[in-house]
């Protein structure tokens, strides 16, 4: 994880063959500039960044479902619950399950655990739109390689 630049997923662990669920991992770094202010002497991963990690996990699943044809953008966070603190050095397991897709929106149930214990969960809604002009798709494809996303399985040649 590099939370200061919003790189929250370190590895795509598994995508189910039906493209309904995904499992990713993210290791909270021992050192990060975000901990200077959150909180001095008691570093905690900000809850909004945990939600971002769950959103990015869902984003990889949505990209797989549409074969990288369109980009998911987080639109709504519903029913977010933060259950405990996350400290530097913890390895997070991030899960997402698609609940509904239609009319350019995707709804997913997401959760984050550490060593099997619940950390947080939320229902997230995404707007799925054509890629913006410019290099964004190329950048996302490079990040996909870094996080071990099986690009060859989900991108048309």
Predicted regions and their residues:
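Short aromatic-glycine motifs in intrinsically disordered, low-complexity regions
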Residues: 1-3, 67
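Catalytic strand-loop segment that frames the active site of acyl-thioester-processing enzymes
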Residues: 4-45
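Hydrophobic core residues within well-ordered beta-strands of beta-rich domains
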Residues: 6-8, 92, 106
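Hydrophobic residues on conserved beta-strands that form the core of alpha/beta folds
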Residues: 9-10, 77, 107, 121
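Conserved positions in beta-strands of structured domains
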Residues: 10-13, 78, 83, 97-99, ...
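Compact, glycine-rich, soluble single-domain proteins
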Residues: 39-46, 50-59, 74
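Hydrophobic beta-strand-centered segment that forms part of the acyl-chain substrate-binding groove
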Residues: 57-95, 119-129
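HotDog/MaoC-like acyl-thioester-processing domains
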Residues: 88, 99-157
